[in-house]
Each structure stands twice: as structure tokens, then as C-alpha cells.
From Swiss-Prot:
Coiled coil: none
Xref: PANTHER family: 50S RIBOSOMAL PROTEIN L32, LARGE RIBOSOMAL SUBUNIT PROTEIN BL32
InterPro entries: Ribosomal_bL32 (IPR002677), Ribosomal_bL32_bact (IPR044957), Ribosomal_zn-bd (IPR011332)
GN (gene name): rpmF
A GO CC term assigned to this protein in UniProt: large ribosomal subunit
Record keyword Ribosomal protein present: yes
Keywords: Ribonucleoprotein, Ribosomal protein
Name by which UniProt lists this protein: Large ribosomal subunit protein bL32
UniProt entry tagged with the keyword Ribonucleoprotein: yes
Length: 61
């Protein structure tokens, strides 16, 4: 069984754990529709991605 040769310092332990925190998702305002969407994701209401129609838009209702 592997055993650490040295004790992990509190600083190193904290640096390792710094990536574990949950972060709020970021949103950007769409240039065309003004709706909020995730960056680098398809706008599901319009079906557009980077100015191109990728999906058929969802019908509201």
C-alpha cells in the first residue's frame, strides 16, 4: 500500500481543494434575441449557434 513520505502542509491541501468549490454558471446575453444563454452553447429558443441555424426552434406552448 502506498504511503506518503511527507506530511501534506495545510497550504498544499488548500491549493488542492481550491478547485472543488461549486461555481455559479456564467451566462451571456445573446446578441440577436437578447436572451441569456451559456457561452459556447446553442440558444435553444432560436436554435442558433454563432450566427448559424443548427436546430429547429422550440415552439412555445
Amino acid at each position: 500500500m502506498a504511503v506518503p513520505k511527507r506530511k501534506t502542509s495545510p497550504s498544499k491541501r488548500g491549493m488542492r481543494r481550491s478547485a472543488d468549490a461549486l461555481k455559479a454558471p456564467t451566462y451571456v446575453e445573446d446578441k440577436d434575441s437578447g436572451e441569456l444563454r451559456r457561452p459556447h452553447h446553442i440558444d435553444l429558443k432560436t436554435g442558433m449557434y454563432r450566427g448559424r441555424s443548427v436546430l429547429t426552434p422550440k415552439n412555445s406552448g
